[in-house]
């Protein structure tokens, strides 16, 4: 069998982590089995679909390095095909036109709720003589079987059984003539020869209806796998209130694609106790057999842990490329300071996000106008004057600008003034960086350069003597 999977998002908003996990699992299943992965944009909700959302989907997939073999396809380019099948269903009696008004349907729903029944269409138009009604607005409903069961084997959940009596007649075409998502997806999967439909459990209730439609047109039924939902700490479906954001917002917050992919892979799937997976390992090891059925808890701290791991372990040049993006976003010219690789080396063990790293290294690329207020109160006191002057003089006379020579100067100053290294380094740190938090000050001075270091020490001395 030639395995084919697909990812079929709706372009009505940002691409969120739940959708990305679905895309990842579908992609990995195809890659593991030597199959094809298709990207399909389900844009039949014309009022809510936007080009911005389409761009966000494609940009997100590219950023995550989830590539596709075919597509992107768009449902709105296939409307004639959907209407062809709808007409086929109308002709063979597997579908019918429904003329029920919104008012009637609302009254029906309220009556069912009041009487403790599950809201569902009652089949009012199911047996109407359709030839007697003309030129009235209507929807088209699928005539769902009223007897028997729909039974299928979910590749994650096992055998699932639905009684057809529990299923109402699904709308497959709206009043304005636009086919519904639940119908279009069936025809697309059929025409694209999708063999495995991997999607979220929120689609589980659609599956028996879709299987019945496939049987009505004499088509094969694909394999199904429904992923458990992702929840927040309150046990509810993950949403914006849990700080869940779109994929490109994670990029903008300083997360690496490797971290997000690795975290989402483990959010519902495991391979022994292994936590870290390369892309090649993901493709080799992934299996639906070990995808868990229960809901997965989204843990922002765990995602940060993954991100910090990759910041520390991926190549310096690769991290520097991501740092370049964030510095440019902040309006910083990275060519007005030290090499980005040097910055990565200084900060990679301290910063959990690339945005953090960019914010922490700004003083390397632009001069600050004032010192951190609290740091200046504590460390830029008259008692620091002699220490800063001594270091300033020694740095001025230093011609061999190396890390070792700077370390020697700081040690010499501490020895000459009979003070601790901390008594030298803290006022010097505030002077050169503007803050009391930074990597080792000798490394900072070495990377930031002689001219800028001396200029800032002079600024600190003037601040003290105001």
UniProtKB/Swiss-Prot annotation:
A motif ('KMSKS' region) lies at residues 237-241. It is an enzyme of class 6 (ligase). Its EC number is 6.1.1.17. InterPro entries: aa-tRNA-synth_I_cd-bd, aa-tRNA-synth_I_codon-bd_sub2, aa_tRNA-synth_I_cd-bd_sf, Glu-tRNA-ligase_bac/mito, Glu/Gln-tRNA-synth, Glu/Gln-tRNA-synth_Ib_cat-dom, GluQ/Sye, GluRS_core. It catalyses: tRNA(Glu) + L-glutamate + ATP = L-glutamyl-tRNA(Glu) + AMP + diphosphate. It is found in: Cytoplasm. Transmembrane segments: none annotated. Gene3D superfamilies: 1.10.10.350, HUPs. Its main location: cytoplasm. GO terms for cellular component: cytosol. ATP binds at residue 240. GO terms for biological process: glutamyl-tRNA aminoacylation. It holds the Pfam family tRNA-synt_1c. A motif ('HIGH' region) lies at residues 9-19. It comes from the Bacteria. Keywords: Aminoacyl-tRNA synthetase, ATP-binding, Cytoplasm, Ligase, Nucleotide-binding, Protein biosynthesis. Belongs to the class-I aminoacyl-tRNA synthetase family. Glutamate--tRNA ligase type 1 subfamily. Catalyzes the attachment of glutamate to tRNA(Glu) in a two-step reaction: glutamate is first activated by ATP to form Glu-AMP and then transferred to the acceptor end of tRNA(Glu). PANTHER family: GLUTAMATE--TRNA LIGASE, GLUTAMATE--TRNA LIGASE, MITOCHONDRIAL-RELATED. NCBIfam families: gltX_bact (TIGR00464). Monomer. This is Glutamate--tRNA ligase. It comes from Baumannia cicadellinicola subsp. Homalodisca coagulata.
């Amino acid at each position: 069998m030639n395995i084919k999977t697909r990812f079929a998002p709706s372009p009505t908003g940002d691409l969120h982590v739940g959708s990305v996990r679905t895309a990842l699992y579908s992609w990995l299943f195809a890659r593991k089995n030597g199959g094809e992965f298709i990207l399909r944009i389900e844009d039949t909700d014309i009022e809510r679909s936007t080009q911005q959302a389409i761009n966000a989907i494609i940009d997100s997939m590219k950023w995550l390095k989830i590539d596709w073999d075919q597509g992107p396809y768009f449902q709105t380019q296939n409307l004639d095909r959907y209407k062809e099948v709808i007409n086929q269903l109308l002709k063979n009696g597997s579908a019918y036109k429904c003329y029920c008004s919104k008012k009637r349907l609302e009254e029906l729903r309220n009556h069912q709720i009041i009487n403790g029944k599950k809201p569902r269409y009652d089949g009012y138009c199911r047996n109407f003589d359709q030839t007697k009604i003309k030129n009235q607005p209507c929807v088209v409903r699928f005539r769902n079987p009223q007897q028997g069961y729909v039974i299928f084997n979910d590749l994650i959940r096992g055998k699932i059984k639905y009684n057809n009596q529990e299923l109402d007649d699904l709308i497959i075409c709206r009043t304005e003539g636009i086919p519904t998502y639940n119908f279009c997806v069936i025809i697309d999967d059929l025409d694209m020869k999708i063999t495995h439909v991997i999607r979220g459990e929120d689609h589980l209730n659609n599956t028996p209806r879709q299987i019945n439609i496939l049987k009505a047109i004499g088509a094969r039924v694909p394999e199904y796998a429904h992923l458990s939902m992702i929840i927040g700490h309150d046990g509810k479906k993950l949403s914006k209130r849990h700080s869940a954001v779109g994929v490109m917002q994670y990029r903008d917050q300083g997360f690496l694609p490797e971290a997000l992919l690795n975290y989402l892979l483990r959010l519902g799937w495991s391979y022994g106790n292994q936590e870290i997976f390369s892309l090649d390992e993901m493709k080799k090891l992934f299996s639906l057999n070990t995808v868990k059925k229960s809901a997965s808890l989204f843990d922002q701290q765990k995602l940060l842990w993954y991100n910090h791991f990759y910041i520390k372990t991926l190549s310096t040049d690769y991290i520097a490329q991501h740092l370049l993006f964030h510095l440019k976003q902040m309006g910083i010219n990275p060519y007005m300071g030290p090499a980005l690789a040097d910055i990565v080396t200084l900060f990679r063990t301290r910063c959990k996000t690339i945005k953090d790293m960019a914010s922490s290294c700004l003083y390397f690329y632009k001069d600050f106008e004032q010192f951190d207020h609290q740091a200046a109160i504590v460390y830029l006191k008259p008692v620091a004057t002699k220490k800063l002057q001594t270091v300033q003089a020694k740095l001025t006379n230093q011609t061999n600008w190396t890390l070792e020579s700077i370390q020697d100067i700081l040690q010499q100053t501490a020895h000459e003034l009979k003070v601790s290294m901390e008594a030298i380094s803290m006022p010097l740190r505030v002077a050169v960086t503007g803050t009391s938090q930074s990597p080792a000050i000798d490394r900072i001075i070495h990377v930031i350069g002689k001219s800028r270091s001396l200029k800032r020490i002079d600024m600190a001395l003037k601040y003290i003597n105001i």
